[in-house]
Amino acid sequence: KIKHVPSIAMKRLIPMGLPKKELEPFIEGFCPDVIHLASPIFLGHYVARLARRANIPTVSVYQTDIAGFARHYGLTVAHNTLKRWVARIHSTTDLTLAPSAWACRDLENSGVQNVKLWQRGVDLVNFTPEKRDAELRAEFLQKRGAKYVIVYVGRLANEKRVDDLAILDSQPDLQLVIVGQGPAEARLRRELPNAIFVGYKSGADLARHVASFDTFVHTGKHETFCQAIQESLACGTVVVGPDTGGPTDLIDHGRTGLLIDTADSHLLLHSVYNLLEHPALDLMQLAARKSVEHRTWDYINESLIEHYRDVIESVASRKNLVA
């Protein structure tokens, strides 16, 4: 069943669901064994407190650094408030799952206890080097007579810092391809005049784009994980990414890509060329694929079910102690 709730869009941030009184009898009537809270804020906190009173186990998932987004936009007061609020929410739940070691540390440093790592899976059948399309690559190279194709995949929003790619867009031998859509697209089209914007892609079409190009570059500094990087690695496409956040769990520096300060334009340019012209690039591409081959969705989901079981047993033990 799906229950719709109202939401609020805070300035420049993603919409957030709001509590609704009708949820309490709905949850009590449904009587779940465990409640999974994805990126809980207002609605999630409300449900977590309901669950606590009803002795229903809760698992919260930390997957969006909303406080970091606020800081990026210069909303210092909002950043500090959201940081404390997020910690308070996750401290209300029985277990918090975070997608990267960085995200786990971030929560623990904020005072959240009982945090465990739960990464993301990747579709290894769809995202594979076999999806490389030489004709697609040649089509993009023809626009400017470039030598290499660089791809960015992700939401086109200010916090993703896609404009940091301007130094790459200015190089005549590099063709930048932007895959995605978002509120910053119009501005980015002006700031990256040589880039090719192909819009939102998914499924096999997305895999074909990621697998066909020479290097994937990601510039967002508030990623708790970054699924786009993982999908790129699965395609055997090496990555240049930020040396902070979730990407540090995914990119093996010097082996499957490079971790750098992507805001340093000269370092970014040097790093991209370093990868493109690396004598062992073919070995790095093989290593990229190998690095994620164990992360099937079956394996990841099985680990989630184990977390559910652990929490259910833990709360049951707590009930027995109280009784």
Descriptions of predicted regions:
Residues 57, 68-88, 98:
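Nucleotide-sugar donor phosphate/pyrophosphate-binding loop at the beta->alpha transition
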Residues 84-133, 138, 145:
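Donor nucleotide-sugar binding/catalytic pocket of nucleotide-sugar-dependent glycosyltransferases
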Residues 139-173, 177:
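Conserved donor-binding/catalytic core segment of Leloir-type glycosyltransferases
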Residues 185-204:
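Nucleotide-activated donor-binding/catalytic signature segment of Leloir-type glycosyltransferases, i.e.
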Residues 221:
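Aromatic "clamp/platform" in nucleotide-sugar-dependent glycosyltransferases that forms part
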Residues 238-241:
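Short hydrophobic beta-strand element within catalytic cores of glycosyltransferases
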Residues 252-254, 258-264, 274-279:
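Conserved acidic donor-binding segment of nucleotide-sugar-dependent glycosyltransferases
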Residues 280-294:
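A short, well-ordered alpha-helix in the C-terminal region of glycosyltransferases
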